[in-house]
């Protein structure tokens, strides 16, 4: 297997700075649409959105594998795949995902599998010798619970991740640091992004895996079908969050592959900040549930505010397009098409 040579003078592929300037312009991702692009995790919410975006842009050589075809947690299988396929671009969107309750219930499983996926893909991309650019998708769970708001990229490792999030966050932090390490030691143009509170088609709906928007959709829809007079929601509803539609992230991925080659990771957030109460009312309206939302202020609701500073991403020319209510409608349509023929009515 050909391997990436160690850089004798540090990061030979440090093609750009925080604004995406420098040598990155000499190698155009959008001008290389016949090159082989490997999307790891193409069946998930993020990977499928990236796949749709590349197809729409006319990329003709996108390579994907199901988990049955390629177990990304198996080092030998990943190395054999890279040696055979020799992709030019790699986008790592694969992960074992679930809410805080799921990862807290199986911490070793989440930590180990996500570390293996990250290490295997980044190392194989570095070793195979064909990869021109690698993008690792992390998560805003990497930041401490007491990070400044909006949270800048520089808040990474200024404290531990929020309690309960660490089993998912630690492998994501490792992915960012691996990108920096292979860039410094081998000159590979490896970059990372940290999207915030993603939602969209293919978001999991089972209670043990879902996040707030799909959970609210499922609960309000069930209450509407059953004629329930109220739906209980934890907390006071005062906590503020931002939510980023996965199609906006897919556009950000293309922008990053085209314009960014900096060492530091990049936040990706919509900038549309809402309270959980406003979110619940928006979901209730989209679903058409006419009952009451009963707020249980005795229950925990997390940190008071969680928003990321996406100024670096916006300097690259990216702007989110999907308004929150439109995104909720999009996800509800997906839920009705793909979930409501089976357990979604009764779970």
From Swiss-Prot:
Site residues by UniProt (Important for catalytic activity): 139
Site feature (Lowers pKa of active site Tyr) residues: 172
Active site: 168 (proton donor/acceptor)
This enzyme's EC code(s): 1.1.1.271
Region described as Disordered: spans on this chain: 1-20
Secretion signal span: none
Catalytic activity, as annotated: GDP-beta-L-fucose + NADP(+) = GDP-4-dehydro-alpha-D-rhamnose + NADPH + H(+)
Residues that coordinate or bind NADP(+): 41-47, 172, 195-198, 211
Listed CDD domains: GDP_FS_SDR_e
Pathway info: Nucleotide-sugar biosynthesis; GDP-L-fucose biosynthesis via de novo pathway; GDP-L-fucose from GDP-alpha-D-mannose: step 2/2
Single GO MF descriptor: isomerase activity
Binding positions (substrate): 219, 234, 241, 301
InterPro entries membership: Epimerase_deHydtase (IPR001509), GDP_fucose/colitose_synth (IPR028614), NAD(P)-bd_dom_sf (IPR036291)
Domain of life: Eukaryota
Function of the molecule: Catalyzes the two-step NADP-dependent conversion of GDP-4-dehydro-6-deoxy-D-mannose to GDP-fucose, involving an epimerase and a reductase reaction.
The protein's assembly and partners: Homodimer.
HAMAP family named in the record: GDP_fucose_synth (MF_00956)
Protein name: Putative GDP-L-fucose synthase 2
Organism from which the protein derives: Oryza sativa subsp. japonica (Rice)
């Amino acid at each position: 297997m050909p391997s990436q040579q160690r850089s004798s003078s540090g990061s030979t592929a440090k093609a750009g700075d925080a604004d995406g300037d420098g040598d990155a312009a000499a190698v155009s991702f959008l001008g290389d649409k016949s090159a082989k692009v490997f999307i790891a995790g193409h069946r998930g919410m993020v990977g499928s959105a990236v796949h749709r975006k590349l197809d729409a842009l006319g990329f003709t050589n996108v390579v994907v594998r199901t988990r049955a075809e390629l177990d990304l947690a198996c080092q030998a299988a990943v190395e054999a795949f890279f040696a055979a396929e020799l992709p030019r671009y790699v986008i790592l969107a694969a992960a074992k995902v679930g809410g805080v309750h799921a990862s807290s219930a199986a911490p070793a499983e989440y930590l180990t599998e996500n570390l293996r996926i990250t290490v295997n893909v980044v190392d194989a991309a570095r070793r195979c010798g064909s990869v021109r650019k690698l993008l690792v998708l992390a998560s805003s769970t990497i930041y401490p619970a007491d990070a400044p708001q909006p949270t800048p990229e520089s808040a990474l490792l200024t404290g531990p991740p929020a309690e309960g999030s660490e089993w998912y966050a630690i492998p994501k932090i490792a992915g960012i640091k691996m990108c920096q390490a292979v860039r410094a030691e081998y000159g590979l143009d490896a970059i990372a992004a940290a999207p915030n509170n993603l939602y969209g088609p293919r978001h999991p709906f089972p209670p043990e895996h879902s996040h707030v928007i799909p959970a609210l959709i499922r609960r309000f829809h069930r209450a509407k079908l059953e004629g329930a007079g109220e739906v209980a929601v934890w907390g006071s509803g005062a906590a503020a969050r931002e939510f980023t539609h996965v199609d906006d992230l897919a556009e950000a991925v293309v922008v990053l592959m085209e314009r960014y080659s900096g060492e530091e990771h990049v936040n990706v957030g919509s900038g549309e900040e809402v309270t959980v109460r406003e979110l619940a009312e928006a979901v209730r309206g989209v679903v058409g549930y006419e009952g009451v939302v009963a707020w249980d202020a005795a229950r925990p609701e997390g940190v008071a505010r969680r928003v990321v500073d996406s100024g670096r991403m916006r300097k690259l020319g990216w702007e989110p397009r999907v308004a929150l209510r439109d995104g909720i409608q999009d996800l509800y349509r997906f839920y009705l098409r793909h979930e409501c023929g089976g357990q979604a009515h009764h779970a």
